[in-house]
Amino acid sequence: MIKSRFAPSPTGYLHIGGARTAFFAWIWAKKQHGKFVLRIENTDLERSTQASVDAILQGIDWLGLNYDEGPLYQTDRFDRYKQIIQQLLDEKKAYYCECSKKRLQILREELTKQGKKAKYDGCCRNKNLHTGVVRFNNPKEGIVVFNDVVKGKISINNQELDDLIIARSDNTPTYNLTVVVDDHDMKINIIIRGDDHINNTPKQINLYQALGWHLPEFAHLPMILGNDGIRLSKRHGAVSIMAYRDAGFLPEALLNYLSRLGWSYGNQEIFSINKIVQLFELKNINKASASFNQDKLLWFNQETIKSSSVKNLLSNLTWHLQNQEIIIKDTPNIEIVVRYLQDRCKTLVNMAGELKMFYQDFDTFDEKLAKKFFKDKTPLKRLFVELEMLNTWKADNIKQVVKQVCFELNIGFGRVGQPFRLALSGDGNAGSIDIVAELVGKNKALLRLKMAIDF
C-alpha cells in the first residue's frame, strides 16, 4: 500500500511551496488508494512555535487535504530517536565529537581557501569520546545512487558527504536522523518533497542502509520561482495560504493552480480535484522550475467561481460575510443573488462586497460619482415616476422603463443607466441594473432613487 506524508517544520506559516508539496503527496496517496500522513517536525525547539503548528493545521484543513494519520509530532518520539542514536553508537556507525565551533570555522575557511568542499575532517572519529555532539560515520568509499521519480538517476560520491551531526550536544536529535526514523517507523514508502531537500537524500540513504532498513522511493518537486526567475518570496506572493482565503480565493482554485506548477495534462487548465487525482502521474512532473503568476491564479479563481455550485460558494462565503459584518436577510433569496454574482466576481471578497447592496442600506453615495451622475436629476425623477407605477417588478419590465425614459428624454442609455446604477448601489459597483433592481426589490429601489434625487 502506498503511504505518503507531508512533514512541515512549524517555524512559520504554510506557504505556496509547502501547500503544493502537501497536495501532490495527498493526490498520490488518493490515486493509489493509499494513506496520507501529516507529521509535524518540531524537534527544533528554539524555532518551533505552537502558533506555526496552528497555522499549518488551519491551512491544511482549509485546503481540504484530509489526512489518514496524524498530526503526529516528533517531540513525542524522543525516546525512539535516542534508541536509534545509541544503536548507531554501539555499532560504531556513529561517534561523539567535541570539536569547538572555532575549530570548525577555521577548518571551513582553510578548505575553502584550498578550493575544496568545506566538510568535517573526521578529527574525533576514532577518539572514543563520550560527550559532545553525535556524528554519523558516513561511508568513506563508494557512490550513493538512487532513481528519483521526477529527476531521474542521481549519484554522489561518498567522499563528497559529511559526517553529519545526528544529535546535538543537548541530546536532541537533528532533522536528518529523525526524518529517516519517522519515515521507516511510519512505513512511508514514497517521499514527495521539494528539490531543496535533494542534497539531504544521499545522507539519509546512507542512514537507511546503516540501519538495515528498506529504502523508500523519492520524488523531488521542482522549485517555484517568481516571474522574474528568482526563488519565490513574499514579494511574489509567497504568503501564508490563509492569506489567499482572506483575499477571497477558493481552496479548489488554489489547488488547481498549484497542480499546474510542475504538472500538466495536454492544454487543459481547469480540473476538478477528483479529475486531478485521476490524471495525475508523478513521472509527468516537469524537472524544470515552475513560475508563480498571481494574475494567472486570479484567473483560475474567477473561472472556478463561475463553475462552482451555489452551495459551495455559500459555504466559502460565510467567513467573508462575517468578516465584512454583512447580515443576510430573508429577501432577496441569497442563492439567487449569488447565482447572479458568480459570473462577474473574481474573488469572494468581491462577491461579499457586492452582496452588501442587496441586504444593507446606506445613507450616502460615492461623492465623486455623485457629482458626475447626479448633476442632472431629471432622468432620476422621470425614472422614479415610471418605476413607481410599474405593477410587475421584473427585470425585463424594469429594462423597458429605462429604455422608455431614454426615449422620452431623447438621451443615451448612460444618462439614465449610470445614475440609476449609483442610486441602487451607493458606489456604482453594480452589474445589470435591471437584474439588480429586481433583486433589491421595488420598495428599496424607490427609496434609494428618492435619496439620490434629494442628495
Swiss-Prot record:
Xref: Gene3D superfamilies: 1.10.10.350, HUPs
This protein's record includes keyword Cytoplasm: yes
Nucleotide-binding recorded as keyword: yes
EC number(s) reported in the record: 6.1.1.17
InterPro entries per UniProt: aa-tRNA-synth_I_cd-bd (IPR045462), aa-tRNA-synth_I_codon-bd_sub2 (IPR020751), aa-tRNA-synth_I_CS (IPR001412), aa_tRNA-synth_I_cd-bd_sf (IPR008925), Glu-tRNA-ligase_bac/mito (IPR004527), Glu/Gln-tRNA-synth (IPR000924), Glu/Gln-tRNA-synth_Ib_cat-dom (IPR020058), GluQ/Sye (IPR049940)
Annotated organism of origin: Vesicomyosocius okutanii subsp. Calyptogena okutanii (strain HA)
Motif ('KMSKS' region): 231-235
A cellular component term, taken from the record's GO annotations: cytosol
Source organism, top-level taxon: Bacteria
Annotated residues for binding of ATP: K234
Its biological purpose: Catalyzes the attachment of glutamate to tRNA(Glu) in a two-step reaction: glutamate is first activated by ATP to form Glu-AMP and then transferred to the acceptor end of tRNA(Glu).
Motif ('HIGH' region): 8-18
Protein's recorded name: Glutamate--tRNA ligase
